[in-house]
């Protein structure tokens, strides 16, 4: 009996030890002496910020747990000043998250390479993005290595380079952003969804086999998607509220905060006004909305007089909400085709005028105009958010003053007899009745 109890105790101990061991021995938490910690605390602040925005920390932790890595870090001014503004804006758009990740992984090798290994012969090494970097004469892809062995750690090394390395796939994605080949017969997709609890990308569901019952309910399939844009707002729905407008409004406000640069807009929608609740109610009723969101720099230019009047924040925001579903492509195609477009706004009866200017969409008139420069921040088929660089105000019509002059009094002319009748009456006297 004692042998049996010892055997059972040994089995239970073995099972508990097995379950306590991690599945991947190299996927534990990194220590303070890791090359990733050195990168985040280094003077390469622009690169570290891009790594955090691209949600690559978890991926790099797993890579460091398996092998050493080599990071080629561009200088801060190469990312801040010497980079094309349009290309940088393209990388920071949520829908281009994959391109940003590929660009950053192109700077990382899954092995340790020190400066003595930079030979004069041409050598190629595979990166974490499955592309190749070519080394020759102290250069990597024709970019000079300015600070070799700048930061050295047990699990990796960081070399400083003079400029950003751009893989061909990312360059092609950037060049196709306005070509017909990238937008013809292609269903627009929303930005990648990020789980707010873990700050990681939500995984796409597995493909549904043929004949399987639908995963989404019918009312989700009924909602008009981006392929129908531009489309007028549908009529109000019934009392069942098939569309969860409050959840969609929360998603787009969370996207504004995560995108960065639109905190003032989100603060007005949630805290200063009740517009977020009103928008959620409209979407629940079946309406679609397009929000022209001014960035923080534009909101900072508002004066105290413009915001101090009762209801001023609501009226300003109402003018930036269009009761239609419009994407950047649909707006740009409309103004290219028709010249000027006047969109209805929730600030009735004022309309928002749009026209094509400098390869983009321009809203408003004169000094109060604004350009669309952050396209498709959030597009889910019912709410579309487009970033603009100014706050719009409706055009004030100046009343035409009527000229007031001295009224001219017209006197009625007295009836006058003809000259011939006067002469005849004078000669013959006033005997005839006509001379009376």
Curated annotation (Swiss-Prot):
Subcellular locations according to the entry: Secreted
UniProt keyword annotation of Chloroplast present: no
Keywords: Glycoprotein, Proteoglycan, Repeat, Secreted, Signal
Matches recorded under InterPro entries: FAS1_dom_sf, FAS1_domain, FLA15/16/17/18
Coiled-coil region: none
Glycosylation sites: 68, 271
Superkingdom to which the source organism belongs: Eukaryota
Function of the protein: May be a cell surface adhesion protein.
Record family assignment: Belongs to the fasciclin-like AGP family.
Record protein name field: Fasciclin-like arabinogalactan protein 15
